[in-house]
């Protein structure tokens, strides 16, 4: 039986527990996941692509079923390069579905082999977004439980905020 692989793309700036939930759910369906860190030149990320890759690898415990990579191109070009045409996208709410549905259809228009698999994050993390985590952390709020411990530690280091108890 061939190994089933999917790509899970995102900015992961920072990686949240919602992202980890999608990775864990994805591994129930696929034998292998490529977590692909997107480099968007129009954004100013808090963490570099290399930092995000390292944080993801550490958070997944260097699981051999998870490859962490990065890309600087259209998703369809990256998918074509990897030869993996199934992409996992996490959904938190109905509003996410509308955007992801449009994106999936555009990607399918650009690359007919493209397939999107939508995965729910679950009730524990449906309200968590990387943008909200960055905002809370920037103002010294406690992000414990919203991000993996290694990410919380790195956020505190990078932003110069104290650890919460």
Swiss-Prot record:
Organism: Anaeromyxobacter sp. (strain Fw109-5)
Keywords annotated in UniProt: ATP-binding, Coenzyme A biosynthesis, Cytoplasm, Magnesium, Nucleotide-binding, Nucleotidyltransferase, Transferase
Role noted for this protein: Reversibly transfers an adenylyl group from ATP to 4'-phosphopantetheine, yielding dephospho-CoA (dPCoA) and pyrophosphate.
A single GO molecular function term of this UniProt record: ATP binding
Record site feature (Transition state stabilizer), residues: 19
Position of the signal peptide: none
Name of the gene encoding the protein in the UniProt record: coaD
Main location: cytoplasm
Protein name, per record: Phosphopantetheine adenylyltransferase
Subcellular location: Cytoplasm
Binding-site residues, substrate: 11, 43, 75, 89
Bridged cysteine pairs (disulfide): none
Alphabetical list of InterPro entries matching this protein: Cyt_trans-like, PPAT, Rossmann-like_a/b/a_fold
Entry binding sites for ATP: 11-12, 19, 90-92, 100, 125-131
């Amino acid at each position: 039986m061939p190994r089933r692989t999917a790509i899970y793309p995102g900015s992961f700036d920072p990686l949240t527990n919602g992202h980890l939930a999608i990775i864990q759910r994805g591994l129930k369906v696929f034998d292998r996941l490529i977590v692909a860190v997107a480099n968007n030149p129009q954004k100013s990320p808090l963490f570099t692509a290399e930092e995000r890759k390292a944080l993801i690898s550490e958070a997944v415990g260097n699981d051999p079923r998870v490859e962490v990579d990065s890309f600087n191109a259209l998703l369809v070009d990256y998918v074509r390069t990897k030869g993996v045409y199934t992409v996992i996208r996490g959904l938190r709410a109905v509003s996410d579905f509308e955007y992801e549905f449009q994106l999936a259809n555009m990607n399918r228009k650009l690359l007919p082999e493209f397939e999107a698999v939508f995965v729910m994050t679950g009730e524990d993390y449906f309200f968590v977004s990387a943008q909200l985590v960055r905002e809370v952390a920037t103002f010294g709020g406690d992000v414990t439980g919203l991000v993996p411990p290694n990410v919380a530690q790195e956020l505190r280091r990078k932003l110069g905020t104290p650890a919460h108890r």
